[in-house]
C-alpha cells in the first residue's frame, strides 16, 4: 500500500522517553504509514538512538533527520512538514505515546474512506504533578484538552463547536497536507507554538471528521517545557499571540475569531489570564521588576493595539476565571501607574 500518512515526531533531548515511545509505535499496524523523526540539533544521544531504531526495523518506513542548528520546537515542526510527501500528517511528541494499538489502522481506514481537511481523535492527558513536586502517575483526564466533539447530521464534526470547546494543541489531529500547505502557515519557535496554527486551520477547514479512537497519551510533566515559568517563556507567549492574529488576518478568519457571539476570543484570553497570572505575583515582580514590567507592558500594548482588552476584559462575566482576570487588571494598573515598586 502507498503511504497515506506521515507521523511527525519533533525531538529535542528526548532520550529518557524514547523507549516508551518506540514500544507504542511497534504495537501499531504500519500499513500505509511512515514515521518521520527530526532531531533539533543537540549534542546528546537522541539522534543515535533514533538511527538505531531505524536500523533495527528496516521493514518499517522510518525517516530520521537532524538539523544543522537548533531551530526550536516550532522550527522543527515546520521542517517536518517540509519532509511530508503523503496526503496526510499527524504530530506526536516523543515524551508522549500512542494509547490504542488500533490508532494507525483507524486513521488509515478513515483516509481510505473519504477525503477531509482535518480529523480529530480522542485523547487522554495524564497529570504527573501536584504541589510540592509530589508526582502522580497515570491519573487520566480523558478528552479534557481535546476530544469534546459535537457531530452534524452528516456525521462531520461541528467545527465551530470544536473550536469553542477544545484547547489548541497540534497533536491528536490528522491534517490534510495539501490543505495545510495552501494556507502557508508557520509555527513560532518556542512555547505555545500550536495556537498560531491551530485556530486558522480549524476555522478554514471545510470538512472535519471524528475518528473514535484514543490517539495520544499526553503526559504533563513538572519539568516539561509546557510547565516552565520564566520571563523568556512569557515573551514567547506574546510572539505566539502576534503570529496568531497575523495568521487569522492572513486566512480571512479574524472576524470569526473576535465575533462576540462565538465567544472564542474571550474564552481564549481568559485562559491566557489563568496561564499568566496563576504564577505571577507581587513578590516575583518586586524581585525582577524592571524585567517583569517590560514583559507585562509588552503584553498590554499588544492587547490595546488589537482591541483585545476592551473586547474581553471590560465586561463582568468571567466565570471560573474571575480571579485570574482580576489579577490581570490589577497588574495592568500597577505596571502603568508605578515607575518602580
UniProtKB/Swiss-Prot annotation:
Q: Where in the cell is it found?
A: Cell membrane
Q: Name one GO biological process term.
A: membrane lipid biosynthetic process
Please name the InterPro entries in this protein's record: Glyco_trans_2-like, Nucleotide-diphossugar_trans
Q: Which UniProt keywords apply?
A: Carbohydrate metabolism, Cell membrane, Glycerol metabolism, Glycosyltransferase, Lipid biosynthesis, Lipid metabolism, Magnesium, Membrane, Transferase
Regulation (activators, inhibitors): Activated by the negatively charged lipid phosphatidylglycerol (PG).
UniProt keyword tRNA-binding present: no
Where exactly are the transmembrane stretches of this chain?
none
Q: Which reaction does it catalyse?
A: a 1,2-diacyl-sn-glycerol + UDP-alpha-D-glucose = a 1,2-diacyl-3-O-(beta-D-glucopyranosyl)-sn-glycerol + UDP + H(+); a 1,2-diacyl-sn-glycerol + UDP-alpha-D-galactose = a 1,2-diacyl-3-O-(beta-D-galactosyl)-sn-glycerol + UDP + H(+); a 1,2-diacyl-3-O-(beta-D-galactosyl)-sn-glycerol + UDP-alpha-D-glucose = a 1,2-diacyl-3-O-[beta-D-glucopyranosyl-(1->6)-beta-D-galactopyranosyl]-sn-glycerol + UDP + H(+); a 1,2-diacyl-3-O-(beta-D-galactosyl)-sn-glycerol + UDP-alpha-D-galactose = a 1,2-diacyl-3-O-[beta-D-galactosyl-(1->6)-beta-D-galactosyl]-sn-glycerol + UDP + H(+)
The cross-references to Pfam families, in alphabetical order and at most eight, read:
Glycos_transf_2 (PF00535)
Q: What is its EC number?
A: 2.4.1.-
What's one GO MF term for it?
1,2-diacylglycerol 3-beta-galactosyltransferase activity
Coiled coil stretches, renumbered: none
**Cofactor names:** Mg(2+)
Gene Ontology, cellular component aspect: plasma membrane
Which CDD domains does UniProt cross-reference here?
Glyco_tranf_GTA_type
Principal EC category: transferase
Q: What is its main location?
A: membrane
Quote additional remarks. Answer: The local lipid environment around the enzyme affects both the extent of head group elongation and total amounts of glycolipids produced. Glycolipids such as beta-Gal-DAG, alpha-Gal-beta-Gal-DAG, beta-Glc-beta-Gal-DAG and beta-Gal-Cer are highly immunogenic and are reactive towards IgM antibodies. Glycolipids with a terminal beta-Gal are more reactive than the ones with a beta-Glc residue.
Q: Which family does it belong to?
A: Belongs to the glycosyltransferase 2 family.
Described function: Processive glycosyltransferase involved in the biosynthesis of both the non-bilayer-prone beta-monoglycosyldiacylglycerol and the bilayer-forming membrane lipid glucosyl-galactosyldiacylglycerol and digalactosyl-diacylglycerol. These components contribute to regulate the properties and stability of the membrane. Catalyzes sequentially the transfers of glucosyl or galactosyl residues from UDP-Glc or UDP-Gal to diacylglycerol (DAG) acceptor to form the corresponding beta-glycosyl-DAG (3-O-(beta-D-glycopyranosyl)-1,2-diacyl-sn-glycerol).
The identity of this protein, by name, is Processive diacylglycerol beta-glycosyltransferase
What organism is listed for this UniProt entry? Mycoplasma pneumoniae (strain ATCC 29342 / M129 / Subtype 1) (Mycoplasmoides pneumoniae)
Amino acid at each position: 500500500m502507498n503511504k497515506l500518512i506521515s507521523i511527525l515526531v519533533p525531538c529535542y533531548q528526548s532520550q529518557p522517553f524514547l523507549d516508551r515511545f518506540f514500544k507504542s509505535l511497534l504495537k501499531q499496524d504500519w500499513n500505509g504509514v511512515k514515521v518521520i523523526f527530526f532531531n533539533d540539533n543537540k549534542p546528546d544521544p537522541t539522534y543515535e538512538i533514533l538511527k538505531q531504531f531505524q536500523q533495527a526495523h528496516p521493514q518499517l518506513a522510518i525517516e530520521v533527520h537532524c538539523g544543522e542548528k537548533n531551530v526550536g520546537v516550532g522550527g522543527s515542526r515546520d521542517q517536518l512538514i517540509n519532509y511530508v510527501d503523503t496526503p496526510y500528517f499527524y504530530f506526536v511528541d516523543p515524551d508522549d505515546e500512542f494509547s490504542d494499538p488500533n490508532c494507525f489502522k483507524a486513521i488509515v481506514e478513515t483516509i481510505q474512506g473519504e477525503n477531509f481537511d482535518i480529523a480529530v481523535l480522542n485523547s487522554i492527558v495524564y497529570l504527573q504533578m501536584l504541589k510540592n513536586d509530589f508526582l502522580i502517575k497515570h491519573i487520566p483526564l480523558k478528552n479534557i484538552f481535546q476530544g469534546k466533539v459535537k457531530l452534524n447530521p452528516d456525521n462531520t464534526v461541528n467545527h465551530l463547536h470544536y473550536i469553542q470547546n477544545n484547547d489548541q494543541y497540534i497533536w491528536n489531529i490528522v491534517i490534510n497536507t495539501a490543505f495545510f500547505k495552501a494556507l502557508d502557515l508557520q509555527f513560532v519557535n518556542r512555547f505555545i507554538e500550536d495556537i498560531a496554527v491551530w485556530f486558522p486551520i480549524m476555522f478554514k477547514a471545510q470538512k472535519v471528521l471524528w475518528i473514535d479512537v484514543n490517539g495520544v497519551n499526553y503526559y504533563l510533566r513538572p519539568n516539561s517545557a509546557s510547565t516552565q515559568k520564566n520571563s523568556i517563556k512569557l515573551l514567547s507567549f506574546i510572539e505566539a499571540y502576534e503570529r496568531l492574529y497575523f495568521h487569522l488576518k492572513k486566512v480571512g478568519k479574524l472576524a470569526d475569531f473576535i465575533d462576540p457571539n462565538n465567544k472564542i476570543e474571550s474564552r481564549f484570553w481568559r485562559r491566557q489570564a489563568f496561564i499568566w497570572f496563576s504564577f505571577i505575583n507581587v513578590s516575583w515582580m518586586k524581585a525582577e521588576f524592571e524585567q517583569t514590567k517590560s514583559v507585562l507592558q509588552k503584553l498590554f500594548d499588544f492587547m490595546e493595539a488589537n482591541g483585545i482588552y476592551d473586547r474581553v476584559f471590560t465586561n463582568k462575566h468571567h466565570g471560573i476565571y474571575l480571579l485570574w482576570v482580576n489579577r490581570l487588571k490589577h497588574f495592568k494598573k500597577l505596571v502603568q501607574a508605578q515607575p518602580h515598586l
